[in-house]
């Protein structure tokens, strides 16, 4: 089982793991995926359908992934990320992790998650350019949901950690897709920049919001009433969510 899932499938998806999606806070342009040497990784089977890659545990049946995170910010804003690597843009993120974004990308591909930005970055285009240069909603990556659990406390949908500055209310449910980052100059950019779950649209991040306001960098803040103390350890779970049709901004 390990050989079939951990090696054969890994070899089949590795070229996809390292292929880019597109570029950022302006409409991305087309790029040719860079050729990158395969990283040395070790996928270990720890259960009937459960595997471990570094600090990431994932389930080939449910397609869920879990890995450790740390509370980095609990009040104030603006914030541009829900999660970054501990060497990433920590001054703009609620959570940090020691997990390698490249390992996370590999795990996502082993679980056959589809990546793509679709029409998410169209809002950075002039209206007259959307038909020619814009992406389509059908080209989006798969819709995902995140939950956060600190120590042995209640598990929360991750959007509950965020406050919408426009309404002064908790962020509403839903709104993230797997965009998959990109490769530039031979580097997997989520690994280079440490950007994992973006709130403010970022083509270098692995996950981006589809909701209205994702292109406004000062709209979102940390919700201190539910976020535990800075330094608190926790776990993020990623799972497939129901695909939603997002109202165009």
Give the ranges of each region predicted by the language model.
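Positively charged n-region of N-terminal signal peptides that target proteins for export
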Residues: 1-5
